[in-house]
Amino acid sequence: MAIDQATVRKIASLARIAISDAEAAAMEGELNGILGWVEQLGEVDVSGVEPMTAVIPNTLRLRDDVVDADPLTGGNRRDDILANAPAAMHGFFGVPKVIE
């Protein structure tokens, strides 16, 4: 796929970027170079490579799901939290209706 100056101008317009003729010509060459490199990546044989989502394993430490008993930082403080809200209804924050 080749990028021409009309495509560069359309992309710049969509991104709300003002570019000059010289900048459009420079971007045309840069974008074509990038797309050529991506095409080269597509030619690499990766049939024997196992897919991965990260370079290092992402493992999370698990902890017990318990409520903290500290009265200042612990859970079960709904009424204290809602006391600071401008509006509360049925134990939830009250917000204005935005969809008719």
From Swiss-Prot:
Keyword Ligase tagged: yes
Coiled coil: none
Catalytically driven reaction(s): L-glutamyl-tRNA(Gln) + L-glutamine + ATP + H2O = L-glutaminyl-tRNA(Gln) + L-glutamate + ADP + phosphate + H(+); L-aspartyl-tRNA(Asn) + L-glutamine + ATP + H2O = L-asparaginyl-tRNA(Asn) + L-glutamate + ADP + phosphate + 2 H(+)
The keyword Ligase is annotated on this UniProt entry: yes
EC number: 6.3.5.-
InterPro entries, per database record: Asp/Glu-ADT_sf_sub_c (IPR036113), GatC (IPR003837)
Alphabetical keyword list: ATP-binding, Ligase, Nucleotide-binding, Protein biosynthesis
GO biological process: one example: regulation of translational fidelity
Pfam families on file: GatC
Molecular function via GO: asparaginyl-tRNA synthase (glutamine-hydrolyzing) activity; ATP binding; glutaminyl-tRNA synthase (glutamine-hydrolyzing) activity
Broad class of enzyme this protein falls into: ligase
Similarity section: Belongs to the GatC family.
Stored NCBIfam families: gatC
Assembly and binders: Heterotrimer of A, B and C subunits.
Record's protein name: Aspartyl/glutamyl-tRNA(Asn/Gln) amidotransferase subunit C
Organism field: Sphingopyxis alaskensis (strain DSM 13593 / LMG 18877 / RB2256) (Sphingomonas alaskensis)
Gene designation: gatC
